[in-house]
From Swiss-Prot:
Listed GO MF terms: G protein-coupled receptor binding; G-protein beta/gamma-subunit complex binding; GTP binding; GTPase activity; metal ion binding
Residues where Mg(2+) binds: S53, T188
GO cellular component assignments: cytoplasm; heterotrimeric G-protein complex
Organism: Schistosoma mansoni
Similarity section: Belongs to the G-alpha family. G(s) subfamily.
PANTHER family reported for this sequence: G PROTEIN ALPHA S SUBUNIT, GTP-BINDING PROTEIN ALPHA SUBUNIT
Protein name: Guanine nucleotide-binding protein G(s) subunit alpha
PROSITE patterns given in the database record: G_ALPHA
Keyword annotations from UniProtKB, A to Z: GTP-binding, Magnesium, Metal-binding, Nucleotide-binding, Transducer
Annotated signal peptide: none
Task of the protein: Guanine nucleotide-binding proteins (G proteins) are involved as modulators or transducers in various transmembrane signaling systems. The G(s) protein is involved in hormonal regulation of adenylate cyclase: it activates the cyclase in response to beta-adrenergic stimuli.
Pfam families with a match to the protein in the record: G-alpha (PF00503)
Keyword Metal-binding: yes
Length: 379
């Protein structure tokens, strides 16, 4: 009898232990559900080189702890590679342009030869003279002329920024600034998640590669998305894709937005539209060398809304007209809801300008909160 009693007690204790464990698991599951429901998941989409990864970097600067000294040092190689890619692209394009461009100073020929023959090698190790040669060559009139024609070949947006500071980038004690890190271009391949909180609200931002071969991965991120942030580089109206020289970059972005907007899995997911690289668009419009109507003929007859011109009356009217032309082009794509419950919210952005992104993201937070409440049928 004693043995039987002990056995019953042991069974009872085991059952209680299992019950307690189950309760703990249920509590954890409930907590995870609450955390999941209280988290705003933002999916960053857009064509390659539109500025998506720069937006993520801004979130780190604004809402996390920015970049540590170690992380800044880790970016040095990527920044120097940007510098090398820039000078190699410009020097290499001189002879292939129609008409071709010659160096202004014949003594710079040996510098260009060094760039094309030595600096372009895969195992190049960035000796001190490379940065000196970059700085000298960058001042050559022929190199500058080739740079001005960069829409005729492929050149990273940060080329001028890093070539202007070639000697600084090459200094032994160089530590990148936040602006250097924002400008640095690194190809995004795969899916990267960034978590941050703003006023006790949790955000998960997913950055997905924008090149065509990367887009098949996008569907992996569609589940439980609060909102899509679609990033389009308006300044690329006179440029073609790296992966398809027959396709205009802005037209690719328009087609890409249309495919997202009309996707049957996303008919209830609203889009926050970042019309990005407004700084570069302004520069191109003011320079007057690449006319928008050459690439978008209907721009010739486009008139910006009167209230828009009045609101921006202190700015150059042609720049304002260009901005809102591209805004309206993208809004045309989203004018038909196709039976869905989604909306498009456009914003003019400059991803390398921290204050601009702070302002825009603050404006978006209320929109994102409403989308989140609607998603869980609380609104």
């Amino acid at each position: 009898m004693v043995i039987g009693c002990c056995t019953l007690n042991n069974i009872s204790e085991d059952a209680k232990t299992r019950s307690d464990a189950n309760k703990q698991i249920e509590k954890l599951i409930e907590k995870e559900k609450k955390n999941f429901k209280s988290t705003h998941r933002l999916l960053l989409l857009g064509a390659g080189e539109s500025g998506k990864s720069t937006i993520v970097k801004q979130m780190r600067i604004l809402h996390i702890d920015g970049f540590s000294e170690r992380e800044k040092k880790e970016k040095i190689d990527a920044i120097r590679k940007n510098l090398r890619d820039a000078i190699c692209s410009i020097a290499g394009a001189m002879g292939s342009l129609k008409p071709p461009v010659k160096l202004e100073l014949s003594e710079n020929r040996k510098l260009r030869d060094y760039i094309l023959e030595t600096a372009s090698k895969p195992d190049f190790d960035y000796p001190p003279e490379f940065f000196t040669y970059c700085a000298k060559l960058w001042k050559d009139g022929g190199i500058q002329e080739t740079f001005e024609r960069s829409n005729e070949y492929q050149l990273i947006d940060c080329a001028k920024y890093f070539l202007d500071k070639a000697l600084e980038v090459g200094a032994p004690n160089y530590i990148p600034s936040e602006q250097d890190i924002l400008r640095c271009r690194v190809l995004t391949s795969g899916i990267f998640e960034t978590k941050f909180s703003v006023d006790k609200v949790n955000f998960h931002m997913f950055d997905v590669g924008g090149q065509r071969e990367e887009r098949r991965k996008w569907i992996q991120c569609f589940n439980d998305v609060t909102a899509i942030i679609f990033v389009a580089a308006c300044s690329s109206y006179n440029m073609v894709l790296r992966e398809d020289p027959s396709q205009n970059r802005v037209k690719e972005s328009l087609e890409l937005l249309a495919s997202i907007w009309n996707n049957r899995w996303l008919r209830n997911i609203s889009v926050i539209l970042f019309l990005n690289k407004q700084d570069l668009l302004t520069e191109k419009v003011l320079a007057g060398k690449s006319k928008i109507e050459v690439y978008f003929p209907h721009y010739a007859t486009y008139q910006a809304p009167a209230d828009t011109l009045a609101e921006y009356r202190h700015e150059n009217s042609e720049v304002v007209r260009a901005r809102f032309f591209f805004r309206d082009e993208f809004l045309k794509v989203t004018s038909n809801n196709n039976g869905g419950r989604h909306y498009c919210y456009p914003h003019l952005t400059c991803a390398v300008d921290t204050e601009n992104i702070r302002r825009v993201f603050n404006d978006c937070r209320d929109i994102i909160q409403r989308m989140h409440l609607r998603q869980y049928e609380l609104l």
